[in-house]
């Protein structure tokens, strides 16, 4: 088909009067230095601005305002000739609206922007579009001026002052703007640049091609070349275009289903020319007005998107002429005249047709050539106002009939004239009228289709008053299988079936829903629910379906595409009481007071409808759903219906292994088995850890009743027993419960019939799925119930189906519980508590774990820790080999399941033993560090050795599972290694007597079976003991408790290992455990694995300042600084430390062109150190570690190699070339005079984090975490309200930035901790901190932080450690040459002395006394045996780069032994 889209020229009839205020407008030239500033428009809530615009350019910025660099903004710009509006509130993802109206036609267009909280509406001429931003806050914050045409250059050059990231990339607007109004008033111009007042730029200054010019400051029109006259060239020969009409006009009203049909087949018409004339009036954008002809020869006249469309085919191809008005649309409810002329000429056997169409003087004329000469005419039906199937007509650009008024429809040619409107009015038999047509012009509302884009979108319509009878019809179209189309219900009423029955709530309701592609009618008038399948065919194939529901009393019909299905409601009631509104497309999420009936499955399952709806009629009256959506600002509801091409899943939009399926113009991600949530499975689902005492309980304020449930969850456990999830009722035994039983998932559904009049079922229905699910791997469970039907699936295994017996299908519950069932009084059995991890608990579409965590529901209780925690349940320590407890005999006759966790350093020991009748027994023991399981079922003892690569007495926790099934398959699993063995013979284990745990009485060891090697009991820790699904308390349930047994797991259970401290934290071995130094990690917590204090620095800039008290300002030779941050800024100051006024010492860490740069000056010149290997303004989390020792410094970003800086000629450079820095002399006077200013950072006064200062814009913007500087955790101090910390500008504290399990690339911000001890020497207070090792350097030397070491500066030998508690520092390996540890040992701090003379005397006296005591102590220690005070190397560890601990090496040289012994008595160690 060939289509020609033709332009139009304007022919005005009559006199057009210009506007009184059309004298001037603002002309924008498009220069970069162009803008107009109006006062701030307070567009936070409900407000409106409007203007008129004219342009010929494709792009340009029209409107802009924001909150000056923080979150909120609104921008309107011309984008490829159309208007595009984008806005954001509270840092939410920006939302954009794109108009379909082309405005670059050099014509005036009216534009309005309407703000309504989260909604913003863009109106261009008569087109209305709106969007809603997904923001937690609904008000928009505005600080800037209202800018039109562009923005000042000073704003473009400074990105921090512009909230929108793209506005500075837009070109300035070129064209005219006038009639600017804000809330119906004209704002005053504050300032402008590059904008001119254009007297000829206003609307309709000169019409019909007249040329405007300014004469004596007034616009003047030159009409000499137009054929018109008058002040504005509007006076033409209107009388020549007037039609002679009779005294009577024939008008008919069409409402969408009516049409005229004139049969031309009996008397075809042909001629060389013909003419079609008619007048129309409508509000509808689309609709067929007239059609005649078949596939190869037809004429089609219709309204298409508010313009008049003429499509003609004369046999050799089709073309389309589209006539549009200058402003607005033709569907403006005004009369418009249409004339179509066709003239045929023949030349050399070739026909030449001239087609002319005129609409209110807008003319389009086209020549059209045919291959063969044929006459014009038709022998087919001639349709007026519509047809039986408009979408199937050849060449029809629209699919629906006309709705509005048609007047004087006439077809005439050289031989005949058909006055079709008159023939219809007079009832001519040749013309058939379909439908009821009113022969007068009546108002007809437009019935545009709307699209529900999300399951959460819906419309609220007026209450449907249909007590005795009523009807509803509509069309719908979708490809999605589930959705609630219509729903309304009445008020809840008390209902008693029997005197003994409880009072329940009943509601009348009406619903039309789609489940699994089938359409159902649901109706309840108080006597019971009827559920009718409308059509035994799926209707989600993307085609339009017409639904017609008719009701008369308790009976009626529902039809789809004229296929009718009758229904009959049970009971005697014939009145339908609906008190709530009628909801279209879904129901509100928070329907307080609305009781959803149990039969409305889609409402209870939160299945909203996604697709299109049109032509809604209620009781024979049309409902303008498009207008209703506009008035309600309905989120997710858009006008029109367009199906986007399939293939949304081709780009794999579902993240993290989410399963994608096609929806209606959208993709749908099934995140059930992924551990993620969100539209695209992009958000981590919350994990809860359960140790047998933890639970989560969701409590509902009223009893919930359902007949359909969708339940899914993920779990991970080492135990074979434990309740995963259960719905429980306060009054009944109703439950839907998921639990682990013998390594399988068991689904139990019990519907209590005892308290209601129903057919009693045989009891709970149970289904089982999966096996060996206690493997400490994630498993996904799904449950689908629809009435009596049950489906249970685990992972990707086949689904297990079941059916509930009886006629009762209603489940009642008050709670949803996990981990522990608290209301056990209503349950016949006591399910075992759960030990493991749960996430992604979904019940009828609601993720309850995440709702509880985020505080989105207020009826949730939980004590389960959030996150994936290591689970050690109820640990007990057997402190000696002779300790044990006894429990009742193990019941393992047919099968057995045992689980426990243990940790020990002992290679041998009896863990479990239970004897029985005859030779029956079981025993579990450690033999040389390996686990043995011995059992005898009467046919002889069998030994199974556990599969482990190395001995298990490694002081780590190990998980042990031992099982025996009815077929005598014995399985032993240790951690992840499994061993299985099948025994023959007897299958029953008959145990008697007590079960011994941890050992047996001493006299019993010699009588144990031969295969049992144990000669003593187990020494160590046991936890999570599970005996066939029972979790005994070894302390309180023990029959006998012998020896030293304590709760918890103490002793040498915590020693430094490679992974003891996370995130490069430094492990410090203690006597019975270890601690982690997190100072330089930006993380916190006992293992450096917890989130720390995080601050957000906003776009306006902010700063956190720590100020030392004036009397306590430190001077340092060594500084250590660490922080983590996320930013997109290319240049910003992170932190600056300044000395007191006049000294000039400072240290600064900042970002320059995306690289981290450190600069400091301690008295001589600026020293720089820079990391150029990685850009840090990429929005990811980065950690920066900076150390300074005198003029030397190291810098490390993330895990990159450490960068070292040694200034040439520095005094310490020479010292580093021959040995280590003697970080011992802390008294400032002892430092060399020529190096004092180069090494000492004097009198530190302030720490400024964020870099922002008033009237400056170089501050940091983003998030910063875990700040640490010389023992100061400023962020934690700020959060605790420390009086020395002050915050200014846009700074706010946030909580957790990310998951603690994420590595640096994933960017989690953590806090740091430090241990400190202080001592006083002379007038200088010295604080020495425990220090971690740098990640890059290694050496065999030890650097011990000491408060005092009596050696001069040339002495570079280290002080030897004493026998006190030791924090060891190992300078890691670095490049050859001058070497300094990247993170020096102590942060040496000098405090200024402000004491009086009396204080000095006191200090001197005290010092003298200390010296005497010290000399005496040295004498005593000198004569002691050296082994009595040396460090116990077995309990002191050296921390390496990844947190591992290495045993201390002796670093003292042979020739320095005496000196070291002399000095070590005067050292203090951390």
From Swiss-Prot:
Residues 1448-1458 have a biased composition (Basic and acidic residues). GO terms for molecular function: metal ion binding. Ca(2+) binds at residues 297, 314, 375. Residues 1448-1470 are annotated as: Disordered. Keywords: Calcium, Cell adhesion, Disulfide bond, EGF-like domain, Membrane, Metal-binding, Repeat, Signal, Transmembrane, Transmembrane helix. It is a single-pass type I membrane protein. It is found in: Membrane. It holds the Pfam family Laminin_G_2. Disulfide bonds join 200-212, 206-221, 223-233, 405-441, 612-641, 649-660, 654-669, 671-681, 1021-1049, 1056-1067, 1061-1076, 1078-1088. Residues 1419-1470 are cytoplasmic. Residues 196-234, 645-682, 1052-1089 form the EGF-like domain. SMART domains: 4.1m, EGF, LamG. SUPFAM superfamilies: Concanavalin A-like lectins/glucanases, EGF/Laminin. InterPro entries: ConA-like_dom_sf (IPR013320), EGF-like_dom (IPR000742), Laminin_G (IPR001791), Neurexin-like (IPR003585), Neurexin-related_CASP (IPR050372), Syndecan/Neurexin_dom (IPR027789). Residues 1-22 form the signal peptide. The keyword Cytoplasm does not apply. The keyword Transmembrane helix applies. One of its GO terms (cellular component) is membrane. Residues 23-1397 are extracellular. One of its GO terms (biological process) is cell adhesion. Residues 25-206, 251-441, 448-641, 687-881, 874-1049, 1093-1291 form the Laminin G-like domain. Neuronal cell surface protein that may be involved in cell recognition and cell adhesion. Belongs to the neurexin family. This is Neurexin-1b.
């Amino acid at each position: 088909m060939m289509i020609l889209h033709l332009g139009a020229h304007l022919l005005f009839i009559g006199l057009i009067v210009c506007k009184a205020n059309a004298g001037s407008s603002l002309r924008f030239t498009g220069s970069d230095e162009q803008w107009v500033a109006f006062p701030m428009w307070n567009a936070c809530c409900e407000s409106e601005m409007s203007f008129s615009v004219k342009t010929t350019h494709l792009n340009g910025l029209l409107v802009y305002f924001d909150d000056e660099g923080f979150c909120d903004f609104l921008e309107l710009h011309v984008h490829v000739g159309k208007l595009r509006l984008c806005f954001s509130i509270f840092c939410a993802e920006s939302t954009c609206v794109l108009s379909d109206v082309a405005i670059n036609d050099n014509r005036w267009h009216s534009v309005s922007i309407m703000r309504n909280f989260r909604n913003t509406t863009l109106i261009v001429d008569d087109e209305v579009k709106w969007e809603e931003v997904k923001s937690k806050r609904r008000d928009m914050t505005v600080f800037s001026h209202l800018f039109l045409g562009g923005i000042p250059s000073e704003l473009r050059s400074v990105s921090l002052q512009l909230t929108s990231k793209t506005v500075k990339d837009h070109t300035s607007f070129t064209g005219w703007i006038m009639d600017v109004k804000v809330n119906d008033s004209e704002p005053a111009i504050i300032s402008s640049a590059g904008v001119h007042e254009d007297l000829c730029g206003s609307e309709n200054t000169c019409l019909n091609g007249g040329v405007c010019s300014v004469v004596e400051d007034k616009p003047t029109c030159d009409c000499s070349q137009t054929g018109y006259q008058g002040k504005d060239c509007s006076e033409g020969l209107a009388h020549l275009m007037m039609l002679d009409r009779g005294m009577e006009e024939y008008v008919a009203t069409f409402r969408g289903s009516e049409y005229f049909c004139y049969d031309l087949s009996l008397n075809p018409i042909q001629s060389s020319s013909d003419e079609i004339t008619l007048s129309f009036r409508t509000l509808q954008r689309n609709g067929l007005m007239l059609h005649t002809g078949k596939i190869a020869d037809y004429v089609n006249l219709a309204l298409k998107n508010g313009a008049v469309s003429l499509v003609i085919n004369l046999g050799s191809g089709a073309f389309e002429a589209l006539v549009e008005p200058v402003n607005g649309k033709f569907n403006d409810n005004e009369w418009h005249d249409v004339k179509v002329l066709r003239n045929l000429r023949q030349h050399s056997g070739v026909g030449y047709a001239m087609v002319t169409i005129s609409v209110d003087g807008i003319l389009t004329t086209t020549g059209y050539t045919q291959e063969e000469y044929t006459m014009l005419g038709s022998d087919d039906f001639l349709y007026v106002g519509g047809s039986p199937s408009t979408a199937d007509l050849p060449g029809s650009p629209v699919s629906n009939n006309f709705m509005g008024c048609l007047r004087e429809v006439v077809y005439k040619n050289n031989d005949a004239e058909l006055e079709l409107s008159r023939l219809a009015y007079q009832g001519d038999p040749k013309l058939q009228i379909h439908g009821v047509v009113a022969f007068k012009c009546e108002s007809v509302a437009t019935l545009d289709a709307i699209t529900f884009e999300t399951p959460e979108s819906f419309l609220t319509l007026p209450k449907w008053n249909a007590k005795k009878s009523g009807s509803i019809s509509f069309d719908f179209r979708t490809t999605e299988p589930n959705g609630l189309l219509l729903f309304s219900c009445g008020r809840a009423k008390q209902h008693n079936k029997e005197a003994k029955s409880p009072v329940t709530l009943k509601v009348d309701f009406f619903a039309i829903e789609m489940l699994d592609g089938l359409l159902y009618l649901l109706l309840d008038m108080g006597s019971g629910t009827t559920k009718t399948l409308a059509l035994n065919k799926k209707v989600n194939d993307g085609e339009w379906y017409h639904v017609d529901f008719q009701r008369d009393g308790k009976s009626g019909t529902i039809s789809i595409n004229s296929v009718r299905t009758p229904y009959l409601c049970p009971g005697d009631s014939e009145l339908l009481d609906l008190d709530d509104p009628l909801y279209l497309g879904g129901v509100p999420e928070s329907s307080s007071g609305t009781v959803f009936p149990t039969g409305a499955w889609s409402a209870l399952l939160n299945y909203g409808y996604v697709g299109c709806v049109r032509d809604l009629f209620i009781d024979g009256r049309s409902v303008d759903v498009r207008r209703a959506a506009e008035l309600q600002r309905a989120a997710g509801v858009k006008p029109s219906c367009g199906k986007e091409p399939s293939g949304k899943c081709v780009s794999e939009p579902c993240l993290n292994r989410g399963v994608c399926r096609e929806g209606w113009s959208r993709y749908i991600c099934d995140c059930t088995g992924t551990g993620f949530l969100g539209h695209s499975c992009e958000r981590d689902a919350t994990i809860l850890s359960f140790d047998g005492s933890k639970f989560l309980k969701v409590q509902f304020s009223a009893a919930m009743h359902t007949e359909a449930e969708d339940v899914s969850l993920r779990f991970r456990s080492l135990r074979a027993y434990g309740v995963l999830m259960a719905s429980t009722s306060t009054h009944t035994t109703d439950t839907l419960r998921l639990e682990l039983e013998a390594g399988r998932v068991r689904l139990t559904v019990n519907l209590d019939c005892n308290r209601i009049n129903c057919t009693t079922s045989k009891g709970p229905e149970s289904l089982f799925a999966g096996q060996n699910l206690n493997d400490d791997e994630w498993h996904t469970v799904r449950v689908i119930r629809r009435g009596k039907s049950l489906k249970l699936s685990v992972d990707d295994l086949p689904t297990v189906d079941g059916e509930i017996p009886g006629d009762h299908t209603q489940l009642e519950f008050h709670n949803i519980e996990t981990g522990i069932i608290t209301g056990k009084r209503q349950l016949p059995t006591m399910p075992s508590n759960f030990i493991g991890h749960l996430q992604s608990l979904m019940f009828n579409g609601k993720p309850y774990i995440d709702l509880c965590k985020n505080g989105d529901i207020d009826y949730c209780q939980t004590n389960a820790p959030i996150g994936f925690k290591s689970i050690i349940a109820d640990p007990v320590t057997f402190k000696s080999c002779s300790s044990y407890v006894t429990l009742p005999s193990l019941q393992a006759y047919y099968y057995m399941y045992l689980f426990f966790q243990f940790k020990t350093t002992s290679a041998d020991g009896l863990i479990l033993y239970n004897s029985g009748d005859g030779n029956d027994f079981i025993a579990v023991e450690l033999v040389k560090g390996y686990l043995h399981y011995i059992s005898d079922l009467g046919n002889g003892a069998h030994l199974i050795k556990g599969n482990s690569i190395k001995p298990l007495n490694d002081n780590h926790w190990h998980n042990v599972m031992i099982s025996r099934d009815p077929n005598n398959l014995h399985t032993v699993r240790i951690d992840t290694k499994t061993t299985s063995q099948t025994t023959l013979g007897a299958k029953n284990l008959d145990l008697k007597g007590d079960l011994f745990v941890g050992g047996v009485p001493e006299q019993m060891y010699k009588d144990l079976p031969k295969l049992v090697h144990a000669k003593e009991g187990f020494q160590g820790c046991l936890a999570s003991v599970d005996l066939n699904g029972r979790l005994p308390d070894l302390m309180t349930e023990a029959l006998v408790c012998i020896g030293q047994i304590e709760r918890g797991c103490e002793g040498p259970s915590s020693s430094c290992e490679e992974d003891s401290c996370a995130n490069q934290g430094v492990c410090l071995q203690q006597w019975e455990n270890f601690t982690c130094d997190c100072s330089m990690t930006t993380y916190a917590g006992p293992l450096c694995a917890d989130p720390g204090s995080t601050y957000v620095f906003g776009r306006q800039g902010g700063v956190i300042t720590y100020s030392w008290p004036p009397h306590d300002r430190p001077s340092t030779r060594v500084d250590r600084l660490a922080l983590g941050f996320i930013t997109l800024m290319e240049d910003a100051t992170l932190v600056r430390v300044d000395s007191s006024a006049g000294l000039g010492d400072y240290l600064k860490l900042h970002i320059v062109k995306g690289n981290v740069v450190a600069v400091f000056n301690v008295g001589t010149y600026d020293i720089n150190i820079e990391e150029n290997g990685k850009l840090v303004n990429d929005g990811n989390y980065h950690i920066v570690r900076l150390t300074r020792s005198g003029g030397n410094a190291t810098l490390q970003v993330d895990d990159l190699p450490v960068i070292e800086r040694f200034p040439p000629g520095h005094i310490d450079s020479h010292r580093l070339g021959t040995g280590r820095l003697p970080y011992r002399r802390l008294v400032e006077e002892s430092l060399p005079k020529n190096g004092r200013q180069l090494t000492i950072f004097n009198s530190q006064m302030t720490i400024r984090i964020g870099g922002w200062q008033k009237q400056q814009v170089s501050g940091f913007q983003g998030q910063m975490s875990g700040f640490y500087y010389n023992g100061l955790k400023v962020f934690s101090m700020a959060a605790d309200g420390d009086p020395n910390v002050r915050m200014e500008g846009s700074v706010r504290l946030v909580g957790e930035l990310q998951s603690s399990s994420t590595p640096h690339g994933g960017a989690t911000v953590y806090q740091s901790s430090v241990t400190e001890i202080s001592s006083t020497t002379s007038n200088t207070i010295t604080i020495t901190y425990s220090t971690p090792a740098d990640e890059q350097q290694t050496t065999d030397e030890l650097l011990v932080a000491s408060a005092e070491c009596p050696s001069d500066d040339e002495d570079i030998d280290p002080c030897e450690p004493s026998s006190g508690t030791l924090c060891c520092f190992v300078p890691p390996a670095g490049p050859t040459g001058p070497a300094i540890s990247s993170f020096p040992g102590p942060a040496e701090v000098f405090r200024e002395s402000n004491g009086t003379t009396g204080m000095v005397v006191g200090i001197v006296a005290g010092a003298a006394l200390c010296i005497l005591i010290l000399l005496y102590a040295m004498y005593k220690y000198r004569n002691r045996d050296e082994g009595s005070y040396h460090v116990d190397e077995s309990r002191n560890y050296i921390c390496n780069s990844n947190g591992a601990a290495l045993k201390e090496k002796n670093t003292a040289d042979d020739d320095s032994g005496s000196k070291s012994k002399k000095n070590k008595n005067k050292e203090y160690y951390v």
